[in-house]
C-alpha cells in the first residue's frame, strides 16, 4: 500500500530501527516506555530525535500523533503485552493497514490459525475478521543475547476489504469473547 508512516513499538536499542531508517520511502516513528532506550536512541540517532517518543502504545491516542493518517505498526513486541497491542491495532484498524511484528511463537501461531484448529481462538477470530494473517517464520531463541526461554514467530497482518460487519460490531466482539 502507499502508507508512508511507520510506528515501531518497543524499539529497544534500535536493532530494527537502524535498518528501517535506511528506507527513504517511509516516515519512521519510534515509541518506547523505557526511558533508557529513548535516551540511547536520541543520543545515537540525533537526526531522528524528534520522532523518538517516550510513551505507552496502549495509552496512546494515535490520532494525536498521526491525525487521520494511516500508519503501519511494526516491532519486536514485548511478549507480556503483545495481545493487547494487537487488540489496540484492531481498535484503530481504519488507520492501521498493516501490522508486522515478532511475537512469542505461541501467540503468533494462535493469531495465524485457521478455523477448526485447536489454537484458533478469540484473537484469531477478531483479527482475521479485519486482517489477512500470514505466519512468516520462526525465530530461534538462541539468536538473542541473552536467549529467552521461548521461540518467537513473525507475522504479517494486512487489512482486508471488510469495512463493516453485517451485524452490531460491539455485540459481535462480545459474542466472540464469550464463545
Regions found by a protein language model. Give the residues of each.
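Catalytic cores of RNA-modifying enzymes
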Residues: 1-178
Amino acid at each position: 500500500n502507499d502508507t508512508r508512516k511507520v510506528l515501531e513499538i518497543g524499539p529497544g536499542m534500535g536493532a530494527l530501527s537502524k535498518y528501517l531508517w535506511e528506507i527513504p520511502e517511509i516516515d519512521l516513528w519510534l515509541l518506547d516506555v523505557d526511558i533508557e532506550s529513548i535516551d540511547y536512541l536520541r543520543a545515537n540517532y540525533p537526526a531522528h530525535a524528534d520522532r523518538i517518543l517516550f510513551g505507552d502504545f496502549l495509552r496512546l491516542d494515535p490520532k494525536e500523533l498521526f491525525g487521520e493518517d494511516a500508519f503501519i505498526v511494526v516491532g519486536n513486541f514485548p511478549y507480556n503485552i503483545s495481545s493487547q497491542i494487537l487488540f489496540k491495532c484492531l481498535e484503530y484498524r481504519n488507520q492501521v493497514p498493516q501490522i508486522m511484528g515478532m511475537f512469542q511463537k505461541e501467540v503468533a501461531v494462535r493469531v495465524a490459525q485457521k478455523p477448526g484448529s485447536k489454537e484458533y481462538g478469540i484473537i484469531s477470530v477478531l483479527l482475521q475478521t479485519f486482517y489477512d494473517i500470514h505466519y512468516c517464520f520462526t525465530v530461534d531463541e538462541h539468536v538473542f543475547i541473552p536467549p529467552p526461554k521461548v521461540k518467537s514467530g513473525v507475522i504479517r497482518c494486512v487489512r482486508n476489504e471488510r469495512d463493516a460487519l453485517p451485524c452490531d460490531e460491539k455485540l459481535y466482539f462480545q459474542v466472540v469473547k464469550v464463545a
